Curated annotation (Swiss-Prot):
Gene3D superfamilies: Zinc/RING finger domain, C3HC4 (zinc finger). Autoubiquitinated (in vitro). Residues 179-188 are lumenal. Signal peptide: none annotated. GO terms for cellular component: cis-Golgi network membrane; endoplasmic reticulum membrane; lysosomal membrane. CDD domains: RING-HC_RNF183-like. InterPro entries: RING_finger_E3_ubiq-ligases, Znf_RING, Znf_RING/FYVE/PHD, Znf_RING_CS. Keywords: Apoptosis, Endoplasmic reticulum, Golgi apparatus, Lysosome, Membrane, Metal-binding, Transferase, Transmembrane, Transmembrane helix, Ubl conjugation, Ubl conjugation pathway, Zinc, Zinc-finger. Residues 1-157 are cytoplasmic. This is E3 ubiquitin-protein ligase RNF183. The gene is RNF183. Its EC number is 2.3.2.27.
Length: 188
């Protein structure tokens, strides 16, 4: 993977810059790195599911029985260079899935599941023609949290406290203008 200085590392197949989602760099046995999306596409069209040929040098990488390409080792050197934390991307059928985890347990927001469609299922190819372009769409997960959970959120608490302080300050300011005006000018 020859990189020019000043450029972000990119996948040599699709030329997209590496990231920690669907373009996570994965290392093959030959030490070449490719994004997980390209490797998933290659593994789905390869006749032998257990052997994955490197697109650059054609060196085979043997996968364990039932092991998806998402379980290949991540190129942590590239992620460290990009200052990114690795995310766990899984391959389910013809879709790459990423579950977005909240950073803090105090910040209660809905986790999202992002999927990347890698093409039609082999059984559905005989039916209606489908759009084979990859699409990334967030799928919100339903929540059972109530308004009570919203009040436990520290960001909401800080916002509510600041609004209360601003309201009290405004009321005191208006009251002080009334009292000062009455006291000095005798207007009433």
């Amino acid at each position: 993977m020859a990189e020019q200085q000043g450029r972000e590392p990119e996948c040599p197949v699709c030329w997209n810059p590496f990231n920690n989602t669907f373009h996570t760099p994965k290392v093959l046995d030959c030490c070449h790195s490719f994004c997980v999306e390209c490797l998933a596409h290659i593994s789905l069209v390869t006749p032998t599911r257990r052997r994955l040929l490197c697109p650059l040098c054609r060196h085979p990488t043997v996968l364990a029985s039932g092991q998806p390409v998402t379980d290949l080792p991540t190129d942590t050197a590239v992620l460290t260079l990009l200052r990114l934390e690795p995310h766990h991307v899984i391959l389910e059928g013809h879709q790459l899935c990423l579950k977005d985890q909240p950073k803090s347990r105090y910040f209660l927001r809905q986790p999202r599941v992002y999927t990347l469609d890698l093409g039609p299922e082999p059984a559905s190819q005989a039916g209606q023609p489908q759009d084979v372009g990859p699409s990334t769409r967030p799928v919100p997960i339903r929540s059972r949290y109530s308004l009570r959970e919203c009040f436990r959120n520290p960001h909401f608490r800080i916002f509510a406290y600041m609004m209360a302080v601003i309201l009290c300050g405004t009321v005191l300011f208006i009251f002080s203008i009334f009292c000062t005006r009455r006291f000095f000018w005798g207007v009433g």
